[in-house]
Design a protein with these regions (language model features):
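Solvent-exposed loop/turn segments at secondary-structure junctions
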Residues: 6-11, 57-60, 67-68, 110-113, ...
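Hinge/lid segment of periplasmic solute-binding proteins
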Residues: 4-60, 88-91, 194-203, 269-270
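Alpha-to-beta junction loops
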Residues: 1-4, 17-19, 167-176
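Short, solvent-exposed loop/turn and secondary-structure capping segments
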Residues: 12-16, 117, 243-246
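Extracytoplasmic/periplasmic substrate-binding proteins
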Residues: 9-11, 137-229
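Helix-loop-helix "hinge/cap" segment bordering the ligand-binding cleft or interdomain interface
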Residues: 25-30, 40-111, 123-156, 219-225
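C-terminal lobe and pocket-closing loops
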Residues: 183-193, 205-280
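A conserved hydrophobic position in a structured secondary element of the catalytic/binding core
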Residues: 4, 63, 176, 222, ...
Length: 280
């Protein structure tokens, strides 16, 4: 067995290297509680499921509570959402942030995945490249914000891009899923916004997902029964998946588990200032 990441899934799914999940004896009923998009990503061109994930990676807008209180008058997620409810409102709020001395995002690249997850069709159709209207809106909105110095053009994961994880970076928001919040925003580093529990989360202009890891069975494996057992335990056992949420603050690929955790008033995120963001 081996693991694949979302951006590289098709490289392996549409090959003979990956074994059909059904050939392991795993049924549609076994996977009934999983989010459909996690299946779609690892379904090959013939409609065959080739991998299973324990993760769901829906993304949210992650904002600085201190900046929200200073500029918007409130750090309540519902109030902040009003200022970022759609892209036109988002870009208008960027002007307000700039006047107050803050960048709306660290980079124009922060919003790309949100726009690109909301296109109406594939990049290549009938052998021709098709640029979706939502991609062009990202280009137009981003150029406007960069020209107005409301954001920058840093590469994701670069040192300059990461400066916004700290108060001196003067960045209002990032976009990301659960893994981004706890594992990528310097939560373990003294002085970071995450370490102080001063980020908040709200839906943002559009829903999106980012990343995820899938378990695949290698074609020809002589450990098929073991691979089946690992996949079923890791991706379908509600108790195990609930423990993953509680222990790691991850978002798991199990609808009943996530619905229960979203309604659990005892669950909260330290990084997000005690907020339970799972109902979004």
């Amino acid at each position: 067995m081996f693991l694949i990441e979302a951006d590289y899934a098709l490289k392996y799914v549409d090959t003979d290297y990956t074994m059909p999940i059904a050939d392991l004896g795993i049924t549609d009923a076994d996977l009934a509680n999983q989010y459909q998009y996690t299946k779609d990503i690892v379904t090959d061109s013939k409609g065959v499921l080739k991998g299973v994930s324990w993760q769901g990676c829906p993304g949210v807008l992650i904002y600085s509570r201190d900046v929200a209180k200073e500029v918007l008058g409130s750090d309540d997620p519902a109030e902040v959402q009003k200022a970022v409810a759609d892209w036109d409102t988002f870009t208008a709020t960027a002007e307000t942030m700039k006047k107050a001395g803050y960048f709306m995002t660290s980079s124009a690249n922060d919003t790309y995945r949100v726009y690109s997850n909301n296109v109406s069709g594939k990049w290549v159709q009938d052998g021709k490249i098709v640029v979706d209207d939502n991609i062009m809106k990202w280009v137009e909105d981003s150029k406007k914000m960069v020209d107005a110095k409301e954001t920058n053009t840093y590469d994701l994961w670069s040192d300059d891009w990461s400066k916004g994880f700290y108060p001196d970076g003067k960045v209002f928001c990032y976009f990301g899923p659960a893994w981004f919040v706890d594992f990528s925003m310097a939560a373990d580093t003294d002085g970071s916004i995450a370490n102080a529990g001063k980020w908040g989360a709200t839906e943002g202009p559009q829903g999106f997902f980012w990343g995820g890891t899938w378990v695949c069975a290698a074609q020809g494996t002589d450990n098929a029964s073991l691979v089946k057992d690992i996949i079923l335990k890791m991706t379908t056992d509600t108790d195990i998946m609930t423990d993953i949420v509680k222990d790691d603050n991850d978002f798991v690929n199990n609808v009943p588990a996530m619905e229960a955790m979203a309604a659990d008033t005892s669950y909260s995120s330290k990084v997000l200032g005690g907020q339970n963001p799972l109902a979004m």
